[in-house]
């Protein structure tokens, strides 16, 4: 299964906003919409971690998807109400406009036993 990991810096003061939103997607009132969105986008696994650093907090994201590039592109253009909310959330807490594209990270290692 194709996968990708990436980080997105959290804007100052936005860590708790992001934490609450991600919990609402995972186990809260947005779970059904989140699951429908990810199914429609072909994302089969999504994990999000918050990493504190001296320079500020980061969201560390891991995706598995049938087609990672298509999932990013479809998320950026989807008219689904949840996907629109999610893009607004990303803009609010990370300062990233998903619609502008997101360059993939360079993978430099992939160990598997």
What are these regions (language model features)?
Residues 5-9, 45-77:
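Short, well-ordered beta-strand segments in beta-rich or mixed alpha/beta enzyme
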Residues 1-27:
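Long, hydrophobic N-terminal alpha-helical segment
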Residues 31-44, 64-102:
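An amphipathic, aromatic/His-enriched active-site/gating alpha helix that lines ligand/cofactor pockets
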Residues 36-37, 52, 108:
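Residue-level signal for alpha-helical context at structural boundaries
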Residues 97-113:
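Short, low-order "capping/linker" segments at domain edges
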């Amino acid at each position: 299964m194709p996968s990708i990991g990436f980080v997105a810096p959290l804007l100052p003061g936005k860590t708790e906003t992001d934490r609450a939103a991600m919990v609402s997607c995972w186990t809260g009132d947005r779970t059904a919409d989140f699951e429908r969105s990810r199914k429609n986008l072909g994302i089969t696994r999504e994990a999000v971690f918050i990493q504190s650093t001296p320079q500020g907090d980061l969201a560390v994201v891991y995706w598995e998807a049938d087609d990672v590039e298509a999932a990013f592109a479809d998320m950026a253009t989807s008219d689904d109400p949840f996907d629109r909310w999610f893009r607004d959330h990303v803009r609010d807490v990370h300062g990233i406009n998903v619609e502008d594209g997101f360059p993939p990270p360079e993978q430099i290692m992939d160990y598997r036993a």
